[in-house]
Amino acid sequence: MKKIFLDLDGTLAKFNVRNALQRFETEKGFFAKLGAYKGIEKINEMAKNGNVYIISASPNEQADSDKMKWIEKYLNNVPIENRLICRCGDNKAEFLKTKGIKIDKNCYLLDDYTKNLVEWEEVGGVGIKRITKVADNSRKLWKGLEVKNLGNLAIVVA
């Protein structure tokens, strides 16, 4: 069965790193207040079959809590055990290994950060670059799959 792993900030949630770096350190509830990109309801619908996971990097416990609130608001069909938070800078594939999840060719990661996608593919998964107006400028370095509209994700992983 295919498993779909989704990054949060900049991929599903409207997060502009250039405008947010100082705010999330001081503004309580910052991550919980982020808006969602168009098409989030299709992702929530996909999650009903239990094979959708959230894997988000977080700087601290307050942000962990905020992100869980965001997930509950927009992606309440994602099973609680599939809502995973690692630390900023962690290799997401390595983190999942510590949770007993092995990445293989049936594991897809949708992320806006090319480094995460490269690390994912190095262990046998399939990376999908999320294209947004604020996606990192390493897009030109990414040669794999891309998704601009969240509603098209189901087509890409079919």
Language model features with spans:
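A short, structured active-site edge motif that brings together acidic residues
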Residues: I55-N60, M68, Y74-E94
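Asp-based phosphoryl-transfer active-site loop
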Residues: K2-N16, W120
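Short amphipathic alpha-helix with an adjacent loop that forms part of the alpha/beta core around
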Residues: E94-K102, K140-A158
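Conserved Lys-Pro-Asp/Glu-containing loop-to-beta segment of HAD-superfamily phosphomonoesterases
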Residues: K3, I85-K115, W120
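Short, acidic loop-to-helix structural element flanking the phosphoryl-transfer center
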Residues: Q22-I54, E61-S65
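Short hydrophobic segments within beta-strands
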Residues: D7, I55-A57, L110
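Acidic, Mg2+-coordinating phosphoryl-transfer loop and its flanking beta/alpha structural elements
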Residues: D104-E146
